């Protein structure tokens, strides 16, 4: 995996995507997985999942992100499906690490929420 490509994707998400900052750990995990799984499907030419309201919500965020990735990063159209999947998995891991694991926000896991 190209570290610079992963850095590009991470910088994009940090700058443009509010779904990574939902108020609870489980919300953040769900959004990171849901949106990025749909992004992966879109970037690899697979049909996105749209069977449930939640899948459609993830699809809406993923569609904007996938279009931006194609527009901003010329390499996105030059990599194969396996590399896209590998990059998205790396992005998920980095987002979980930064927004959940190393977060100092104590409300993420507060028992009253």
From Swiss-Prot:
Task: Look up the record and name the cofactor or cofactors this protein needs.
Answer: iron-sulfur cluster; vanadium cation
A Pfam family annotated for this UniProt entry: AnfG_VnfG
For this UniProt record, give its keywords in alphabetical order, as a comma-separated list: ATP-binding, Iron, Iron-sulfur, Metal-binding, Nitrogen fixation, Nucleotide-binding, Oxidoreductase, Vanadium
State any single GO MF term: ATP binding
Q: Which reaction does it catalyse?
A: N2 + 8 reduced [2Fe-2S]-[ferredoxin] + 16 ATP + 16 H2O = H2 + 8 oxidized [2Fe-2S]-[ferredoxin] + 2 NH4(+) + 16 ADP + 16 phosphate + 6 H(+)
Coiled-coil ranges per UniProt: none
**What does this protein's UniProt record list under function?**
The key enzymatic reactions in nitrogen fixation are catalyzed by the nitrogenase complex, which has 2 components: the iron protein (component 2) and a component 1 which is either a molybdenum-iron protein, a vanadium-iron, or an iron-iron protein.
Q: Can you name this protein?
A: Nitrogenase vanadium-iron protein delta chain
Gene behind this protein: vnfG
């Amino acid at each position: 995996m190209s570290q610079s490509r992963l850095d590009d994707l991470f910088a994009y998400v940090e700058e443009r995507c509010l779904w990574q900052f939902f108020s609870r750990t489980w919300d953040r995990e769900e959004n990171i997985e849901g949106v990025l799984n749909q992004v992966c499907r879109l970037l690899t030419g697979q049909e996105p999942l749209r069977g449930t309201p939640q899948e459609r919500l993830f699809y809406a965020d993923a569609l904007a992100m996938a279009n931006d990735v194609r527009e901003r990063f010329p390499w996105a159209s030059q990599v194969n499906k396996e590399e896209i999947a590998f990059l998205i998995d790396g992005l998920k891991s980095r987002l979980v690490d930064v927004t959940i694991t190393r977060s100092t926000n104590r409300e993420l896991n507060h028992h009253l929420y």
